[in-house]
């Protein structure tokens, strides 16, 4: 049995008011790697099939497909062989169910975790500090809606995997799905596109702060923890669990809903950025508190309505929704208000999808400057925005603007991904090609 030997420079400790946490035993500078953790289990998003290797998450052309289901793609025979213990859970089922094979990403990940747990004889390299079974589940905090969703996931697991997997009892499944809900990571690329879902037990020990001193990024199927501030010996390390663009009330609501806790970091107690994030238009008539409150309610409803509409509305209808809400919000909010920025960012995404590059640039240019003010210094949200803009400028033959945007993205990426990361070397190559 592999013992919990620890990670050099990192200590687990009882963090006051937060339960378990991690702190450093030596100093770390900005951009320095604190530690990395291989995924315990992971699954590639269906939308990325054919573009990324199912085993190592390398993006490349000319991947070889599985001869049986023709739906899984690999770098080579070696990757395919390594992935078989997991792919065999799905290969025959995909052939049998055909178009009706539709388990959620969460269900697919849990199936793989169950298979891994069954085959596992000793502590894995993903569990140097924390065993998978020791992760928080928060079963007692689940409301009826979450419980129903979990029951639906369990039904999906039985429907799609019962032929190839022996399941633990119902209570154990409830716990496992809850653990994945609270501790699962969305693996993202340099443009923050969703590549898949994974579980990293050791990374789950990181507590949250809205003013984080580390960031979690990905190198293939490994998660890496890098410093985004200078960290002194004895300091706790914090990452952010959520998008930090929004004002304090919104962040706290999201943390309570998703992770069952409230944050008391400096940013949440001082609310120092809220005035800037909620900037109001300068008008000849005074804008009253009620008008602002009503518009905040409208903005939050618009965001939720848009999120739901993405499932079934056409790009044209979605863009119209964005434009209508931006116009209405603009009567009260300034263009740098986070609710307007949110809808502009969505509008940019639709323009990219429909290949309206001029439209995408128009929205992107409105968003990028406020982003650099409202997000922390080394933010993937800012880097990915500069990257997208850079690629749009190049496509529109605006090379100087493209190189400038790439350079700004690179400054952030070298810190959050590391100077030797493929994303960084590929971007440098892209810049040299011009």
UniProtKB/Swiss-Prot annotation:
GO cellular component: cytoplasm; cytosol; nucleus
Reactions catalysed according to its record: L-lysyl(4)-[histone H3] + 3 S-adenosyl-L-methionine = N(6),N(6),N(6)-trimethyl-L-lysyl(4)-[histone H3] + 3 S-adenosyl-L-homocysteine + 3 H(+); L-lysyl-[protein] + S-adenosyl-L-methionine = N(6)-methyl-L-lysyl-[protein] + S-adenosyl-L-homocysteine + H(+)
Classification via Gene3D superfamilies: 1.10.220.160, 1.25.40.970, 6.10.140.2220, SET domain, Tetratricopeptide repeat domain
Residues reported in the UniProt entry to bind Zn(2+) 1: 53, 56, 75, 79
A GO term, aspect molecular function: histone H3K36 methyltransferase activity
SMART domains, A to Z: SET
Location in the cell: Cytoplasm, Cytosol; Nucleus
Residues annotated as binding S-adenosyl-L-methionine: 18-20, 138, 207-208, 259-261
Domain SET: from-to ranges: 8-242
Residue sites binding Zn(2+) 2 per the record: 66, 69, 87, 91
GO biological process entries: heart contraction; heart development; negative regulation of cell population proliferation; negative regulation of transcription by RNA polymerase II; peptidyl-lysine dimethylation; peptidyl-lysine monomethylation; regulation of DNA damage response, signal transduction by p53 class mediator
Assigned keywords, A-Z: Chromatin regulator, Cytoplasm, Metal-binding, Methyltransferase, Nucleus, S-adenosyl-L-methionine, Transcription, Transcription regulation, Transferase, Zinc, Zinc-finger
Catalytic activity, EC: 2.1.1.-, 2.1.1.354
Entry-linked Pfam families: SET, zf-MYND
Zinc finger (MYND-type): 53-91
Primary location: cytoplasm
Role: Protein-lysine N-methyltransferase that methylates both histones and non-histone proteins, including p53/TP53 and RB1. Specifically trimethylates histone H3 'Lys-4' (H3K4me3) in vivo. The activity requires interaction with HSP90alpha. Shows even higher methyltransferase activity on p53/TP53. Monomethylates 'Lys-370' of p53/TP53, leading to decreased DNA-binding activity and subsequent transcriptional regulation activity of p53/TP53. Monomethylates RB1 at 'Lys-860'.
Record-stated family: Belongs to the class V-like SAM-binding methyltransferase superfamily.
Identification of the protein by name: N-lysine methyltransferase SMYD2-B
């Amino acid at each position: 049995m592999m013992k919990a030997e620890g990670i050099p420079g990192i200590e687990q400790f009882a963090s006051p008011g937060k339960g378990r946490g991690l702190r450093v035993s030596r100093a770390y500078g900005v951009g320095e790697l604190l530690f990395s953790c291989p995924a315990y289990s992971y699954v590639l998003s269906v939308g990325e099939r054919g573009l990324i290797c199912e085993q190592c998450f390398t993006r490349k052309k000319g991947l070889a497909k599985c001869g049986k289901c023709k739906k899984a793609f690999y770098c080579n025979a070696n990757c395919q062989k390594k992935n078989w213990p997991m792919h065999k859970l799905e290969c025959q089922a995909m052939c049998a169910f055909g178009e009706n094979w539709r388990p959620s990403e969460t269900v697919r990940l849990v199936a793989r975790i169950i298979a891994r747990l069954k085959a596992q004889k000793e502590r894995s390299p993903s569990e140097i500090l924390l065993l998978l079974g020791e992760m928080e589940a928060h079963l007692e905090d689940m409301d009826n809606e979450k419980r129903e969703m979990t029951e639906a996931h369990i039904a999906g697991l039985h429907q799609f995997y019962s032929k190839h997997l022996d399941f633990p009892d119902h209570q154990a499944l409830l716990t496992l799905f809850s653990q994945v809900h609270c501790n699962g990571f969305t693996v993202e690329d340099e443009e923050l596109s969703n590549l898949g879902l994974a579980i990293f037990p050791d990374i789950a020990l990181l507590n949250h702060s809205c003013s984080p001193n580390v960031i979690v990024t990905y190198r293939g199927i490994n998660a890496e923890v890098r410093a985004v501030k200078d960290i002194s010996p004895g300091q706790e390390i914090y990452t952010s669990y959520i998008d930090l663009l929004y004002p304090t009330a919104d962040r706290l609501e999201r943390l309570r809903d998703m992770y069952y806790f409230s944050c008391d970091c400096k940013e949440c107690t001082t609310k120092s950025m809220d005035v800037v994030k909620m900037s109001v238009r300068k008008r000849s008539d005074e804008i009253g508190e009620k008008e602002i409150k009503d518009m905040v309610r409208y903005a939050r409803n618009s965001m939720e309505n848009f999120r739901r509409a993405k499932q079934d509305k056409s790009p044209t209808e979605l863009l119209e929704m964005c434009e209508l809400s931006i116009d209405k919000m603009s009567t009260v909010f300034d263009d740098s208000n986070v609710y307007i920025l949110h809808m502009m960012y969505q509008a940019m995404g639709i323009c990219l999808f429909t290949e309206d590059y001029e439209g995408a640039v128009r929205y992107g240019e409105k968003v990028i400057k406020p982003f650099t003010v409202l997000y922390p210094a080394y933010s993937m949200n800012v880097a990915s925005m500069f990257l997208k803009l850079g690629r749009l400028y190049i496509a529109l033959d605006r090379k100087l603007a493209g190189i400038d945007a790439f350079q700004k993205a690179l400054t952030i990426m070298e810190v959050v991904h590391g100077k030797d990361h493929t994303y960084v070397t590929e971007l440098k190559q892209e810049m040299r090609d011009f």
